[in-house]
Amino acid sequence: MSNTKEILEKYNIKLDTNKSQNYLIDDNKLNIILENADIQDNETILEIGAGIGTLTLPMAKKAKKVIAIEKDPIIVDILKQQIIKEKLTNIEIIKDDALKVDFPKFDKVVSNLPYQISSPVTFKLLEYPFKKAILMYQLEFAKRMQAKPDTHEYSRLSVALSYRADTKIIDTLPPEAFIPKPKIKSAVIELIPKNNKPIDKLLDNTIRALFQHRNKKAKKALIQSAHELGVDKKVLKQKLSNVTNDLFEEKVFKLTPTQIKEISLILEGNL
């Protein structure tokens, strides 16, 4: 929003990049986000890290309701004044940490996420039912979200997310699109949840154990991270000595999400 700089200057606000306070100032990029969100007048939109309302205000003009989460009390006061100025009555502000509050019911989530909480807030969102998310991340993080096996970006995040959602990069943003300029490029991701049953704890623990040693063979990685499975190393080594499945001899970064799920099922039968 072109007047973002003016608002910050008016209230003498110095943004803190250590708190991921990088505000979008490129109107073209803002419009791309709004177009892809495809907000309808019967939808409730959740926004995490609302800031001074760059996304909040235009979304509220389209949506039934916007739930805006922002934990900085000074920024919240400015947001409230912007809402009054625009004469909007369908915005609920939650002044709190997004990782510590329960989210009210919502249809879509549209946010310029604070980058330092990208991973935990994404997985928290996926515990709730919703139609679609349009979210901004660091570009490198966005690439890891949708990385394929046997690539440099393939990670625990790639696998854990693949069971829960379909993702695609719909736009990239240079540092100049923000104030202050971050040191990295950013990306806008479309995320569509999969309506699967919840991921079981053993599978999540298996992913975590494997990717602590992504360049090692699966069996060795699991043994070295046996604590993640709640098992003693020696006990796990003995149990896995009876397993002959070739997947356990494959390097972790080459395993597909389907193969990792198979490994988890084998572990379930042996632990």
Curated annotation (Swiss-Prot):
UniProt GO molecular function: RNA binding; rRNA (adenine-N6,N6-)-dimethyltransferase activity
Gene (UniProt): rsmA
Keyword Manganese attributed: no
HAMAP family: 16SrRNA_methyltr_A
The protein's name in its UniProt record: Probable ribosomal RNA small subunit methyltransferase A
Alphabetical keyword list: Cytoplasm, Methyltransferase, RNA-binding, rRNA processing, S-adenosyl-L-methionine, Transferase
Function: Specifically dimethylates two adjacent adenosines in the loop of a conserved hairpin near the 3'-end of 16S rRNA in the 30S particle. May play a critical role in biogenesis of 30S subunits.
Disulphide-bonded residues: none
Main location: cytoplasm
EC number(s) from the headed UniProt entry: 2.1.1.-
Family statement drawn from the similarity comment of this UniProt entry: Belongs to the class I-like SAM-binding methyltransferase superfamily. rRNA adenine N(6)-methyltransferase family. RsmA subfamily.
Keyword check for S-adenosyl-L-methionine: yes
